[in-house]
Amino acid sequence: MIWHVQNENFILDSTRIFMKAFHLLLFDGSFIFPECILIFGLILLLMIDLTSDQKDIPWLYFISSTSFVMSITALLFRWREEPMISFSGNFQTNNFNEIFQFLILLCSTLCIPLSVEYIECTEMAITEFLLFILTATLGGMFLCGANDLITIFVALECFSLCSYLLSGYTKKDIRSNEATMKYLLMGGASSSILVYGFSWLYGSSGGEIELQEIVNGLINTQMYNSPGISIALIFITVGIGFKLSLAPFHQWTPDVYEGSPTPVVAFLSVTSKVAALALATRIFDIPFYFSSNEWHLLLEILAILSMIFGNLIAITQTSMKRMLAYSSIGQIGYVIIGIIVGDSNGGYASMITYMLFYIAMNLGTFACIILFGLRTGTDNIRDYAGLYTKDPFLALSLALCLLSLGGLPPLAGFFGKLYLFWCGWQAGLYFLVSIGLLTSVLSIYYYLKIIKLLMTGRNQEITPHMRNYRISPLRSNNSIELSMIVCVIASTILGISMNPIIAIAQDTLFSF
C-alpha cells in the first residue's frame, strides 16, 4: 500500500515537471527560435549519418550551413524587438545579445567551407566534426543570452567541452593530443575559478542567481562594497581572463593553436572570444556595477600586459599558427578598451565593430594558412618564402589579411582600431590608448616581415616545400578559396563603408 502511494506521488510529480517544461517550451520557445534551428540541424545530422552511406556527405555540409544561415535569418527578423526575459528569468533576448549571437553564427558559417577539403584530405570523421561545431555554436549562443549564473555556467561548459573535443580531433597526432590535454586542464581550472567567484557573488547577494536580482540582493544586504565582492571580482576576472587568453593567463593558447587542426583553430580563435566578451560585458556591467573602478583597473592591467607580451613574443615565432596565437592575445587587449569605455562613449559599439572586422581578417588569414598547409604540409614561416612566384593569388590574399590585422590604411583593421582607440581617448584612457598605438605599430613589423618573405624570397631562402609547391590556377572551385575571397573582400572594403556598421552597433539597446 505504501509502495502504491509512493508510486502515485512519483507519477504526479513527474507529470507536473513534464507539464511545466512543456509549458515553458510552448510559450517561451519562440525566444530561442534561432537556437532551436541549430538543435533541429543537430538531430537531422544524426539521423542522416545513421541511415545513409558515405555518398551523402555533401548533405551533411549542406544541412550544417543551412542551419547557420536560417539561424542568422531568424535573428535578423527578430531585430529591434522589445527586450524580453524568458524561461523563468534564465534567458534574456535583446539587440545587444543578438549582435554577439550574430557574430558567432557568422564565424561558424564561414568555418564550414574552410573545413571541407581539410577533412577530406586528413580523412577525419565528418559527422562528429560538424556535430561539435554546431553544439559549440549553440553553447556560445546560449551564453550570450544567459541571464543567471547557472545558465551561464552550463552554456559555457557546453561550449568548452566541444572546444576540447575539436582540439583533439586528430587523435593520431601527438601535438593535437598534447594541445587537448593542456586545453582541458587549463580550461577546467579556469571554469573552477570562475564558479568559485560565482559562489561569492551568490552568497553576498543573499542567494540570488539572476544577474539583476544579484544587484538588488547586494543593495538589500549592504554587501556591494564588501570584501566578498572584491574576492568574487578577482576570481571571475581571472576565469574570464583564461577564456579570453588575456596575459598572464594565455599560456595554453600557443600550444592549442599549434597542435589543433587549423579549421578548428580558425573557429575557436573567434567564437571563443566573442562568447567570452558577451559574458564579460554582462557580468562586469550588471553584478559589479558598484565596483566599476575596481574592474576597470583590473581590465586595464590585463589589457596592457596582453598588448605588450602578445606582440613582443609574436616577433620571435617561427610557426605561423603560433604567431597568430600571440597576435590574438594582443588583439584581445585592444578589444578590452571597448569594455572599459562602456556604453556611454561608444565603447561597446567600437568593440562590436572591431570584432566584425576581426572575423574577416582572422578567418581570411587562416583560410590562406589552410590552403598553404594542404599544398605543402607545413606552417613554418620560412617555408612561405617566394610564395608570390608560385601562387600570386594566395600570396596577395594573405598579405592583405595580415596588413589588415596590422591596422594599415585603407583596410578594415585600420578603421576598426582607429574607432576603438578614438573611443578610448574620448573616455580619458590616454595611457591605455598610447600603449595600444605603440604595440599596434610593433605588430606591423612582424606582419611586414612575413609579407616581405612572401613577395621577395631569394633563391637561397626558398625551402624544398616551396620548390615542390603545386601551382594552382588563379581561382579554383574549392570551398576554402571561396571563404578566403569573401574574407579578403570584407577585410578590404568594410572599413571604407563602416558608418552603417557603427550606426547599427550604436543602435543596440543595452537593456537588461
From Swiss-Prot:
Keyword NADP: yes
InterPro entries: NADH-Q_OxRdtase_suN/2, ND/Mrp_TM, Ndh2_N
Coarse class of the protein's main subcellular location: plastid
Keywords tagged on the record: Chloroplast, Membrane, NAD, NADP, Plastid, Plastoquinone, Quinone, Thylakoid, Translocase, Transmembrane, Transmembrane helix, Transport
Its EC number(s): 7.1.1.-
Catalytic reaction annotation: a plastoquinone + NADH + (n+1) H(+)(in) = a plastoquinol + NAD(+) + n H(+)(out); a plastoquinone + NADPH + (n+1) H(+)(in) = a plastoquinol + NADP(+) + n H(+)(out)
Membrane-related topology note: Multi-pass membrane protein
Segments passing through the bilayer: 31-51, 57-77, 99-119, 124-144, 149-169, 183-203, 229-249, 261-281, 295-315, 323-343, 354-374, 395-415, 418-438, 484-504
Location(s), subcellular: Plastid, Chloroplast thylakoid membrane
Biological processes per GO annotation: ATP synthesis coupled electron transport; photosynthesis, light reaction
GO cellular component, one term: chloroplast thylakoid membrane
GO MF terms, alphabetically ordered: NADH dehydrogenase (ubiquinone) activity; quinone binding
Assembly behavior: NDH is composed of at least 16 different subunits, 5 of which are encoded in the nucleus.
Recorded family membership: Belongs to the complex I subunit 2 family.
Function noted in UniProt: NDH shuttles electrons from NAD(P)H:plastoquinone, via FMN and iron-sulfur (Fe-S) centers, to quinones in the photosynthetic chain and possibly in a chloroplast respiratory chain. The immediate electron acceptor for the enzyme in this species is believed to be plastoquinone. Couples the redox reaction to proton translocation, and thus conserves the redox energy in a proton gradient.
Protein's UniProt name: NAD(P)H-quinone oxidoreductase subunit 2 A, chloroplastic
Organism listed in the record: Arabidopsis thaliana (Mouse-ear cress)
Gene name of this polypeptide: ndhB1
